[in-house]
Each structure stands twice: as structure tokens, then as C-alpha cells.
A protein has these predicted regions:
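Short, well-structured N-terminal submotif of metal-dependent ribonuclease cores
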Residues: 1-22, 32-49, 76
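Nucleotide phosphate-binding site architecture
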Residues: 2-3, 28-31, 57, 108
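Flexible glycine-rich beta->alpha loop in the catalytic core of nucleotide-sugar glycosyltransferases
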Residues: 7, 98, 105
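Short catalytic/metal-binding and nucleic-acid-binding patches
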Residues: 19-22, 26, 33-36, 54-62
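Short, solvent-exposed loop/turn segments at secondary-structure junctions
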Residues: 27-29, 63-64, 105-106
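Active-site neighborhoods of divalent-metal-dependent phosphate/nucleic-acid chemistry enzymes
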Residues: 45, 54-102
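A beta-strand edge to alpha-helix "cap/lid" segment located at domain peripheries
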Residues: 81, 106-109
Length: 113
């Protein structure tokens, strides 16, 4: 979304922004990336424009419970995923939401996501 491509995805986002949300974990990842970039102010402004049109969902107890269950299940299978990916997956699953991502490899391992 932030890179505004592909154009088809941007149109879909703009048409459906009122029905979309972002995890506070995802927002933290985006802000971290902006702060490390060579164009901090420009990237922070783009991120603010992006998330200002979305509901930012706080990570709470329900998400933490899903996180523990997902982590244990994936460890038993010997297929752990990254810490932030774990938090994001747990958050989406705990809210019964559809997760939109380019990182299919890790998120596809999460049961019932």
C-alpha cells in the first residue's frame, strides 16, 4: 500500500479503507522501518497518511492467548515463524480477521488463520 503498487491494489484499498484495520504491531514495524530509512520525514508522513484512514487495533489479552497457542503449535511442528509475524498472526486470528500480506511463506504455517 505504501509503495502505491500495484495500482489495482491501491484502488481496492481506497475503495475499502473504511472496512480495513491495521494491527498496532504492524504499525510499529512500519514506523521502525521509516525511522531507519534515509528519508525519515517523508516515510513517516506516508505511514501517517496510510494508517490515518484505518482503525489501528490494539494488541491485547485475546491476541496474547492466541499467540501462545500458535507459538506452541508451530514449535511442536518444528516450523516457528518470526516474532512479529507471530504477533500479527495471533492478532488477526483473535479478531477473526483476514490477513493481507506478501509474506505467504510464514503466515501460511499458522493454523486457522
Amino acid at each position: 500500500m505504501l509503495k502505491r503498487r500495484p495500482v489495482e491494489v491501491l484502488f481496492t484499498f481506497n475503495a475499502n479503507a473504511s472496512r480495513m484495520a491495521i494491527s498496532s504491531i504492524t504499525l510499529a514495524e512500519l514506523l521502525h522501518g521509516a525511522e531507519k530509512s534515509s528519508r525519515v520525514s517523508e516515510n513517516l508522513a506516508a505511514i501517517e497518511d496510510f494508517y490515518s484512514r484505518l482503525e489501528v487495533l490494539p494488541y491485547g489479552t485475546k491476541a496474547a492467548q492466541h499467540d501462545g497457542a500458535i507459538r506452541a503449535a508451530l514449535e511442536k511442528l518444528g516450523q516457528p515463524i518470526g516474532v512479529n509475524e507471530m504477533h500479527i498472526a495471533a492478532h488477526a486470528r483473535s479478531e477473526g480477521l483476514v490477513l493481507v500480506t506478501n509474506n505467504i511463506g510464514e503466515f501460511a504455517r499458522v493454523p486457522a488463520l
